[in-house]
Each structure stands twice: as structure tokens, then as C-alpha cells.
Regions:
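Noncatalytic carbohydrate-binding groove/subsite architecture in carbohydrate-active enzymes
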Residues: 186, 203-228, 260, 276-443, ...
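N-terminal substrate-binding region of glycoside hydrolase catalytic domains
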Residues: 31-57, 63-146, 151-174, 181-228, ...
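C-terminal beta-strand-rich structural cap/linker in extracellular carbohydrate-active enzymes
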Residues: 569-596
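Bacterial N-terminal signal peptides that target proteins for export
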Residues: 2-12
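Aromatic/acidic polysaccharide-binding cleft in carbohydrate-active enzymes
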Residues: 422-513
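Loop/turn elements at helix/coil->beta-strand transitions in domains of secreted/extracellular proteins
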Residues: 76-80, 103-108, 153-159, 237-241, ...
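Carbohydrate-binding surface patches
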Residues: 507-546, 585-591
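N-terminal signal peptide c-region/cleavage motif recognized by signal peptidases
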Residues: 21-23
Length: 596
């Protein structure tokens, strides 16, 4: 089934909106639908209302209000996503594609995180890693670009992360000509004679038609090393989103080990010399990345002007700082950590990186990429065991702070251009070293179920759960984990191009999301975040008259799924005013048709 070409309604604009009631990156003009203007004006009030009441224990009754005539966001085709690694030996397992479809997944990020900056699509081998913290992953034999392209086409689409950090020989940085050749292979026309030129190492990257021709060709009887690219697919795949480099801000410019491979400056032979050679080196500076990004974007778009090219940003945590520990300079806007605080952090690093990159590259940036692990001990309170309460609060609390900081950065550094810049979370999940007790695994599913609709409401176009395998989504036997079932619940709530509608809860311990589906039916999601206490949701729905029969889906502590599926069951007695019992640690989706 070919699903890689999505057709969007002309009125849909997938861009991040301000959380504070002003325009951020949403395109609001005379051509914008009235509901979209209303979304921008009303979003802050609705988000603030949900976060207003913060309790640890859910009340016995919670008031839920749904307004079906007030859209609050449209699900972009790329939102429901996972990250796949070239090292994943189970990516090509026969049942993976059906599992992804069952969870509503339409997008798979490739080739992964740090490995992307040593990955070379035309050779399917990494350049020699020279950084100080090797990612220690291999290449599975069935995950080359040709094989992945066939896989991706059956799932839906992808976001590619091209190599910024290293050339094929491992003697210098990634090159725009190689990235342009990758675009040519995936999206090019075999008759296109445009020359791609030579890279800094002298490699000739031929023409657009050369790479597109490889894609359409049959394998040679005697393999010349390129047969893995010959997949007999003459039609371009039409992949839209391309990211230049992975977490480039970790290249050592701000000190540390230089976790991301970036050979724009050579690595020292001795690790102890790393800080001296790389810290504050102009070749690794955010302005240098911004300048190089512009060249990447221009050469890639010269192959296919329809693509969108994005940059990784450090996570802008405005609003997440403990004000007892930090003081903000009213003139510079920089933060100073108080001397009495024992655990020191460089909060300003992310501000400096994002400002430098955006001020240099804004005119070519189509989207920005963030990575978010709300359980990460280096980014939150320092816990090593899962803090379930904090994780379940993150979609309404921490996420709003992150996006508020991002909106601020975009407005300050990109001006009017900020209106058209989209936002992707190309990695999201729970840090792998956080301990998750077996009895608490359900929390990961509730978090995923809550997170994805919230991202849709905020205008985010993509969120890649990390990882497809061994990130809680699937294990190595392809047994689904809690995040998988959480995303199944989102899939029950809505599909891409369905609209979220206004929904509010009187308690922060009961999340609510609602959708108006393509057939006019209501999708209602309720999530009880209390581990011990049940509640009853007193639901009032306006804007359309509902039928008395619907389907109910439950996932949670007392409602374990089948081996692979959260199954729905018929529900009677529904109306525009109804009471829904909610057990502890449970997500419920109710789909109710319009009354006839």
C-alpha cells in the first residue's frame, strides 16, 4: 500500500502558535480560516485553564467541558511517529509494518540520532567516529537506504536527518553536495541533468538524474557496490522534511566531551585536550553552523524546491527554571544560578546556541527540531527512578514552558519569518537510564496518550518516539509496550487532518482532549493520572448533538490490553450531558457519532 504522498487541505497550516495569546508562527492573514484565527486568540486561555488547578489527588467528580464548534488544531500527517536506528536488527521484521499501522504511526525518522552524523547513504557504512563518546551501534544489513525507502513507503513517510558532521573518509565535515545527492536519490527525476558538483574531499556527486536513475534501476548481475540503491522505483518518493545534523549543539563548542560528531574542527588525539581545542572554537560556533546550514539548505532545495529543511535547537526552557535558584538579568535576559545551589547547570547555553543559529540562518529555516525526554536526570530534578507524577504533568506544564521559550526565541531572532517556521520533536520519550518499575510502566502509555494530542493543539508537526525498539514502544520480540498502547489510544481519538476541539477539565489530575473527526463524530479522551483514586467525569458537550450509542476504548492499570490491541466495546446511554466513570491510572477514548 503506497502511503508516502499526503495531500493536505488548502486551509491547513501546521505551525506553532503562541501560548500567550499573540501570534508566533501561525500564518494568520486574510486567507486564514476564521476558526484558525480563533485558535490563535483562544489557545492561551484554554491551556491556562487546564493548568490552573494543580492537585495531587483527583477529586471524586471532575467537570469536563467540550465545545465541538471551536477547533484548536489539526493533526498533521507526520505527528504520529517513531525513530528507527540503522542498527535496529528488527526493523525489517515481517510484523513491524502492521504493528505501526495499528498504532496509527505514519512517520519513521531515519537513520537515528548521533549515528546520523557518521551515516553515508551511498555507501551504507559509517565514517570513523572521532568524538569522545562513541554511540556504539552497528549497521543492520537490511536497513540501507534502498531497503528503508521501501519500508517507509508502506508505513507512510519519514523525516531524514542528513550528515552534517563527517565526510565518508572521516577526514572532514559533512558536505552539502552529499546531502543534495541524498535528496536526488529520494525525490529526484531520472532525466534531471543538474550537476551536484564535488565535495571538499574531491568526490564527484554526479547529477540529480544519476541518483534518481539508481533508484529506478534493477540490480546488476555483478554488484558494483550500489545494488542496494537499485530498487526499481522510478517514481520519486516525495519526502518533505529533512533535518541537517543531530543535536549539533553538543559538538563541544560549549565544552564537555563533544558528544556529536562534528569534524568542522578536528578532534584532538588526547581526550584531555578536547576542551582546549574545541571549546569556543569559531568553527563549531552556532553562527558557523547557521552559515553552513544555509549552504546545505540551498543545495538541497536546488534539487527539490518543495522540501522543508530544518535545524536542531537546544531545548529552550523559559518558564521551567526554579526561581529560587536562578536570577535573570533584566537587561541581557541571561540567567545566573545562585551561589547556594549545589548542582550547577549552564542554562544559558541553549539560549546562546539558538540565538546564534537563528540569527544567522532564519531565512532558510523551514522547521526547528527539539529533543525532549522529560524524565532526563540532566534536564529535570535529578531523580533516577521514574517520577510518575512529574512525567504525567509534563504535557500540560513543562511542554508549555518549552514552547513558550521557543516562541520567544523565534520572535526575537526571526521577526516576521517566525510565522512560517514549523516545529518538530524528532526525539521524545523517557530516557533509557531512568528506572521504570514494572507496576509503573502503564504511566508511559498514559504519558504518550496525553502528549500527542497536546502537541497537535500546540501546532507541532512531528513527534518521534525514541525508539521503535527498546524505547518501550516494541521490544526485540515485537511485543508492544505501554507507549505503543498510548499511541493506539490517540489513533482511536483522531486521524491526521482531523481537528482537535476546545476541551477543559476542572482538575489537572484528569486530562481531556476532544476531536471532531472527518465524519462529524466526537472523539473524547479522558486520562485519570491518579494512581489510587477513581473519579467520575461530568461531561458537557456543546456545538453538535450527539447520538446515544458509541464506542469506548480503555487502557490502564485495571484495563490491560490484548497482546497487541486496545479493543473497543459498544457503549450506550451517551448524550451531550453524561457521566463517565474513570478508574485510577486509566485512559479512556469514547467515539460518539452525530445524532441522526
Amino acid at each position: 500500500m503506497k502511503r508516502s504522498s499526503f495531500h493536505l487541505p488548502a486551509t491547513c497550516a501546521y505551525a506553532i502558535l503562541s501560548l500567550w495569546g499573540s501570534i508566533a508562527t501561525a500564518q494568520i492573514d486574510n486567507s486564514t480560516p476564521e476558526w484558525k484565527k480563533e485558535q490563535t486568540r483562544g489557545q492561551m486561555e484554554d491551556a491556562a485553564a487546564q493548568a490552573a488547578v494543580k492537585t495531587v489527588k483527583v477529586p471524586k467528580e471532575v467537570k469536563v467541558n467540550v465545545e465541538m464548534d471551536k477547533p484548536r488544531g489539526v493533526m498533521a500527517p507526520w505527528v504520529m511517529a517513531v525513530q528507527a536506528l540503522v542498527s535496529d536488527a528488527h526493523l525489517s521484521d515481517p510484523d513491524v509494518i502492521q504493528l505501526l499501522r495499528s498504532a496509527g504511526i505514519t512517520t519513521v525518522r531515519y537513520p537515528g540520532g548521533r549515528i546520523a552524523d557518521t551515516y553515508h547513504f551511498s555507501a551504507y557504512r559509517p565514517s570513523n567516529w572521532q568524538g569522545l563518546d562513541h554511540p556504539n551501534v552497528g549497521y543492520a544489513p537490511t536497513n540501507d537506504l534502498g531497503s528503508f525507502s521501501r519500508f517507509m513507503e508502506q508505513v507512510g513517510t519519514t523525516i531524514f536527518t542528513v550528515n552534517y558532521g563527517s565526510n565518508g573518509a572521516g577526514t572532514g565535515p559533512g558536505d552539502p553536495a552529499e546531502a543534495a545527492a541524498w535528496v536526488a536519490y529520494v525525490n529526484g527525476n531520472p532525466t534531471d541533468t543538474k550537476m551536484l558538483g564535488k565535495d571538499s574531499a574531491g568526490n564527484d556527486w554526479q547529477t540529480v538524474g544519476y541518483w534518481a536513475g539508481l533508484r529506478g534501476a534493477a540490480p546488476l548481475p555483478s554488484d558494483d557496490g550500489k545494488n542496494f540503491l537499485r530498487i526499481q522505483h522510478p517514481t520519486p518518493f516525495g519526502i518533505r522534511y529533512w533535518e541537517v545534523g543531530n543535536e549539533v549543539f553538543e559538538n563541544g563548542y560549549f565544552g564537555g566531551e563533544g558528544l556529536e560528531e562534528d569534524l568542522h574542527v578536528p578532534y584532538p588525539k588526547e581526550a584531555k585536550e578536547n576542551a582546549k581545542q574545541r571549546k569556543k572554537n569559531a568553527g563549531l560556533a552556532p553562527e558557523a553552523y547557521g552559515k553552513n546550514f544555509v549552504q546545505f539548505a540551498q543545495e538541497m532545495k536546488a534539487v527539490d524546491a518543495r522540501i522543508k529543511v530544518g535545524i536542531p535547537l537546544d531545548k529552550p526552557l523559559a518558564g521551567q527554571i526554579n526561581r529560587d535558584e536562578w536570577t535573570q538579568d533584566p537587561v541581557t535576559g541571561k540567567y545566573q544560578q545562585n551561589a547556594s545551589v549545589s548542582v550547577k547547570e549552564d542554562f544559558n547555553k541553549g539560549i546562546d546556541w539558538d540565538k546564534g543559529v537563528l540569527s544567522t540562518a532564519c531565512n532558510q529555516v523551514d522547521f526547528v527540531s527539539l529533543h525532549w525526554y522529560p524524565s532526563d536526570t540532566t534536564q529535570d530534578s535529578g531523580y533516577k527512578d521514574l517520577d510518575s507524577y512529574k512525567l504525567l504533568a509534563a504535557p500540560q506544564d513543562t511542554l508549555r514552558a518549552i514552547l513558550a521559550g521557543l516562541v520567544d526565541q523565534l520572535q526575537k531572532n526571526c521577526g516576521q519569518r517566525a510565522r512560517s517556521i514549523q516545529v518538530a520533536f524528532t526525539e521524545v520519550g523517557v530516557a533509557p537510564y531512568v528506572k521504570v518499575p514494572e507496576q509503573e510502566e502503564v504511566v508511559l502509555g498514559l504519558f504518550a496518550a496525553d502528549l500527542y494530542p497536546q502537541l497537535v493543539e500546540y501546532g507541532v508537526i512531528n513527534a518521534d518516539w525514541a525508539e521503535l525498539h527498546n524505547g518501550g514502544f516494541l521490544d526485540n520480540r515485537n511485543k508492544p509496550g505501554a507507549p505503543y498502547f498510548g499511541m493506539q489510544m490517540v489513533h482511536a481519538l483522531m486521524n491526521f487532518n482531523d481537528a482537535l476541539v476546545a476541551a477543559s477539565s476542572s482538575s489537572s489530575m484528569l486530562s481531556v482532549h476532544a476531536s471532531k473527526r472527518a465524519d462529524g463524530s466526537l472523539g473524547l479522551m479522558l486520562i485519570n493520572k491518579d494512581a489510587k483514586n477513581a473519579t467520575t467525569a461530568k461531561v458537557q458537550v456543546s456545538g453538535d448533538k450527539l447520538a446515544a450509542m458509541g464506542m469506548r476504548f480503555d487502557y490502564g492499570k485495571t484495563n490491560p490490553p490484548d497482546v497487541r490491541t486496545v479493543r473497543g466495546k459498544a457503549m450506550e446511554g451517551l448524550s451531550n450531558s453524561m457521566s463517565i466513570p474513570m478508574p485510577p491510572y486509566t485512559a479512556t477514548v469514547i467515539v460518539i457519532p452525530k445524532a441522526q
